[in-house]
Regions:
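Helix-helix packing/entry segments at the starts of transmembrane helices
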Residues: 16, 43, 85, 89, ...
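Membrane-interface helix-cap regions at the ends of transmembrane helices
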Residues: 21, 28, 48-70, 139-155, ...
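C-terminal-most transmembrane helix of multi-pass membrane proteins
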Residues: 1, 45, 146-148, 219, ...
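Juxtamembrane helix-entry segments on the extracytoplasmic side of multipass membrane proteins
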Residues: 4-9, 33-42, 67-73, 147-170, ...
Length: 309
């Protein structure tokens, strides 16, 4: 396995882990500080987007705006922001409201299967045995882990399936669509502009100008974690990892996010999990090992487009 791919695996895992940590902060802000979560989603995307674009501008100058010189790339950026970032977050939020985080998370983690189907139909790329096993383990492991969060198959109603599956589509688009843009313009500017696009769309959809939160030092700490670690670091790390190891492996490895959320919820908020949850963690960790072993095998030559996603 090349060093380039090792870094990609580490970055993908880092992005998923800090995203899970931000979920604990969101739970704290919503449950203990009465924060309007729609306001929080809008605020974190716009704030993180502005900070990310400013950072990219300080590093790269006006070249960060070169993506807008191409109509094709501008359209690709809009697709990434609207049908990737914004879609996966808004629909995930809707699924949580209707059925709880457990069902919403399980449905969202159908994304790796969707990516594999897309790769097969678009490029004729058949999934490896390791990828198929990893997708199954990740999905079953997530179901086991979410069993501690009130997961019940009775909650699978038509509206829940609609929003949950749309959330998975959003994750798939978010993982696949920007890869060429990331390689051309760099991860940071593309992620920053994608956040701004999705943030402004969230402002229009939610129209929530007030947080209604109880503000103290811990509210500020929670917001900092959500914006900086859970948005800026997690999005940039995950997509840089996807650029290095591909969308399928990246989406599978992102299933460590529920483990991170479960551990932090247990340590900081007193959440509990049983042996079924531990079994789910073991299954998800097994996917990391399988992906790493897959990467050690000689990779067959692929077409340029298929290899970039």
């Amino acid at each position: 396995m090349k060093r380039y791919e090792v870094i990609g695996i580490v970055l993908t895992l880092l992005g998923a882990i800090v995203w899970g940590g931000s979920g604990t902060s969101v739970q704290f802000l919503g449950n203990f500080r009465n924060m309007n979560l729609e306001w929080l989603i809008t605020m974190r995307l716009i704030t993180a987007g502005l900070l990310t674009v400013l950072y990219a501008w300080f590093r790269q100058g006006n070249s960060v705006f070169h993506v807008f010189r191409s109509a094709r790339d501008t359209l690709g950026l809009i697709i990434f922001g609207v049908f990737g970032m914004a879609l996966c977050q808004y629909t995930y939020f809707r699924a949580i409201v209707l059925a709880g985080a457990g069902i919403a998370t399980v449905l969202q983690y159908l994304a790796p299967s969707m990516i594999i189907i897309y790769m097969l139909m678009r490029y004729g790329k058949r999934p490896s045995r390791g990828e198929i096993i990893s997708v199954i383990l990740a999905l079953v492991g997530t179901i086991c882990l979410m069993g501690n969060d009130g997961f019940s198959f009775e909650s699978f109603r038509g509206d829940v399936l609609f929003w949950g599956l749309l959330s998975a589509v959003g994750v798939a688009v978010y993982s696949v669509s920007p890869v060429r843009l990331l390689a051309t313009y760099g991860t940071i500017p593309i992620v920053g502009f994608g956040m701004l696009i999705s943030g402004f769309l969230a402002a229009v959809l939610f129209h929530q100008p007030h947080s209604y939160a109880v503000w103290d030092v811990w509210t500020i700490v929670g917001c900092f974690n959500v914006v900086f670690l859970g948005t800026i670091v997690s999005f940039n790390a995950y997509l840089e990892g996807v650029k290095r190891i591909g969308a399928v492996s990246g989406a599978i490895l992102s299933s460590v996010e529920p483990i991170s959320a479960a551990f932090l919820g247990w340590a900081l908020l007193g959440n509990q999990f049983n042996w079924i949850g531990i079994l789910g963690m073991a299954m998800i960790i097994a996917t990391i090992i399988i992906i790493a072993l897959e990467r050690r095998k000689p990779q067959p030559k692929r077409t340029e487009n298929a290899n970039t996603v």
